[in-house]
UniProtKB/Swiss-Prot annotation:
Main localization, broad class: secreted
GO process terms (BP): defense response to Gram-negative bacterium; defense response to Gram-positive bacterium; innate immune response; killing of cells of another organism; negative regulation of cell adhesion; negative regulation of lipopolysaccharide-mediated signaling pathway
Transmembrane residue ranges: none
Pfam families xref list: Defensin_beta_2
Gene Ontology molecular function, alphabetical: lipopolysaccharide binding
Polar residues bias (residue ranges): 109-123
Propeptide residue interval(s): 65-123
Protein name: Defensin beta 118
Record keywords, A-Z: Antibiotic, Antimicrobial, Cleavage on pair of basic residues, Defensin, Disulfide bond, Secreted, Signal
Gene that specifies this protein: DEFB118
Any single Gene Ontology cellular-component annotation: extracellular region
Function of the protein: Host defense peptide that exhibits antimicrobial activity against both Gram-negative bacteria, such as E.coli and S.typhimurium, and Gram-positive bacteria, such as S.aureus and B.subtilis. Inhibits cell adhesion of E.coli on intestinal epithelial enterocytes. Causes rapid permeabilization of both the outer and inner membrane of E.coli, leading to morphological alterations on the bacterial surface. Binds to bacterial lipopolysaccharides (LPS) with high affinity, and may thereby be involved in immunoregulation through LPS neutralization.
Signal peptide: 1-19
Amino acid sequence: MKLLLLALPMLVLLPQVIPAYSGEKKCWNRSGHCRKQCKDGEAVKDTCKNLRACCVPSNEDHRRVPTTSPTPLSDSTRGVIDDILTVRFTTDYFEVSSKKNMVEESEVGQGTQTSLPNVHHSS
């Protein structure tokens, strides 16, 4: 029983003493740790999950952002796909002229007549 009472405080204090045991995640290109509060000599560079700060040692230059290398072009010759992708879009323009006087005269002279369409039934 005494051994259990000694082991229990050790298990509770162990995550406080060993940072890697507490499960702190790495951040900022694996040079920082996610913590609730940064220690002395550390600067906040980003935010982690669960509202934690990414604490990076301030004595190193961590201004660089991880970069990716550009994708090399494997073939510089043009193919069918290139021709399809370089199709230029055109827009057709239509002019609409209003002949209001002519429409009014034709409606007055003839009257508005509507005819029903012929319906053919097949048996």
